[in-house]
């Protein structure tokens, strides 16, 4: 009698391979901490409008070059030649979408929310301390790049429609929730690093109420934002404008300096009146002046950003003035008593090389860009 054949075992379903965890994000340079010196005063209110409006001109996009194996992509940051598009079928649409979203009133903070919505209950110094706390919070948990910019964007929009008390614990909860919400938007792996209970525990709430308090605040913030979370920030535009940069040391220094200038502008109440693309372009202008020491703008950059150097005059001068005051204050605090004075550039480093003010480059520019 033939032996009975055993049934074949069912195939084992293997779980799908996990995606590689992203590399540790770049840690931004630390922003100043409270108490803040006199240079942290808000920007003066602009005349004749809520915020600078970019020139009404058609954004020039570099045409697609013929596909040739010997046609290199131009990566020099000082080149004036036409650059090929990285994603030709969608480059125009991406550019148009970003520009439309940044000018959408529904996704912009109120120009004077401290004076109107907050009614004087919150000062520019209190807001600056919230931004500094949010920066420390995001760096402590090593959250994704761009989290601080988006969190500040959420905070300003939230404060534009929601009156807040001056309770320090409540303001910390608002700031921490903005960071938590922004981090989840920027990186899908955020919950591997931090959750609502961890957010509330660091804010001083007890174990019985901490998760509930963060969830309630997150719901309130989402409602205040109208569930519109994807508006571009200055970080978005710095990455967009430098997308043609290579991996060279100079290009990396320029991008890092541009992000440092953009992040530094978050501390000062008033920069939110500038469009994010203007803040980003001005940050690149000052970064080139800081790193290269010459030629902060070019026709290539004017075509890429859509702004001439003269269009950036107001934001560049405001940003440079705040950066110089912050650097001077930091230098005075760190200089030993009786030490001889040395030159300070906009990044706070000691140099003997004098730096020409940015507005002189703009005024002396004889070109159309």
From Swiss-Prot:
UniProt keyword annotation of DNA-binding present: no
SUPFAM superfamilies from the UniProt entry: Cyclin-like
This protein's record includes keyword Kinase: no
The entry's keywords: Cell cycle, Cell division, Cyclin
Molecular functions (GO terms): cyclin-dependent protein serine/threonine kinase regulator activity
GO cellular component: cyclin-dependent protein kinase holoenzyme complex; cytoplasm; nucleus
An individual GO BP term: cell division
InterPro entries, sorted: Cyclin (IPR039361), Cyclin-like_dom (IPR013763), Cyclin-like_sf (IPR036915), Cyclin_C-dom (IPR004367), Cyclin_N (IPR006671)
Pfam families, A to Z: Cyclin_C, Cyclin_N
Sequence similarity: Belongs to the cyclin family. Cyclin F subfamily.
Protein name per the record: Putative cyclin-F1-1
Annotated source species: Oryza sativa subsp. japonica (Rice)
């Amino acid at each position: 009698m033939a032996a009975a054949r055993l049934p074949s075992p069912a195939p084992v379903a293997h779980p799908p391979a996990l995606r590689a965890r992203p590399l540790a994000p770049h840690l931004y340079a630390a922003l100043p901490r409270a108490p803040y010196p006199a240079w942290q005063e808000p920007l003066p209110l602009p005349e004749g409008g809520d915020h600078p409006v970019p020139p009404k001109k058609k954004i020039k996009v570099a045409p697609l070059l013929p596909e040739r194996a010997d046609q290199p992509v131009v990566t020099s940051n000082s080149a004036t030649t036409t650059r090929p598009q990285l994603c030709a079928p969608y480059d125009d649409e991406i550019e148009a979408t970003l520009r439309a979203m940044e000018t959408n009133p529904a996704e912009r903070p109120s120009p004077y929310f401290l004076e109107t919505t907050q009614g004087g209950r919150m000062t520019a110094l209190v807001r600056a301390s919230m931004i500094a706390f949010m920066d420390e919070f995001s760096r402590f948990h090593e959250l994704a790049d761009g989290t601080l910019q988006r969190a500040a964007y959420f905070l300003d929009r939230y404060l534009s429609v929601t009156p807040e008390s001056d309770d320090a614990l409540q303001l910390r909860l608002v700031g921490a929730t903005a960071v938590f919400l922004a981090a989840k938007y920027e990186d899908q792996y955020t919950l591997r690093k931090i959750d609502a209970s961890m957010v509330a525990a660091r804010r001083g709430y007890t174990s019985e109420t901490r998760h509930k308090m963060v969830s309630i605040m997150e719901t309130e913030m989402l409602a205040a934002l109208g569930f519109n979370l994807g508006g571009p920030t200055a970080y978005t535009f710095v990455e967009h404008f430098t997308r043609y940069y290579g991996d060279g040391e100079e290009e990396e220094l320029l991008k890092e300096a541009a992000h440092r200038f953009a992040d530094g502008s978050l501390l000062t109440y008033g920069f939110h009146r500038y469009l994010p693309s203007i803040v980003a372009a001005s940050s690149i202008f000052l970064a080139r002046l800081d790193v290269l020491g010459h030629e902060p703008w070019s026709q290539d950059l004017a075509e890429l950003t859509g702004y001439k150097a003269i269009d950036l005059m107001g934001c560049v001068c405001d940003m440079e003035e705040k950066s110089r005051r912050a650097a001077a204050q930091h230098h005075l605090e760190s200089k030993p008593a009786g030490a001889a004075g040395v030159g300070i550039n906009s990044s706070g480093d000691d140099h003997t090389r004098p730096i020409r003010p940015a507005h002189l480059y703009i005024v002396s520019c004889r070109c159309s860009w």
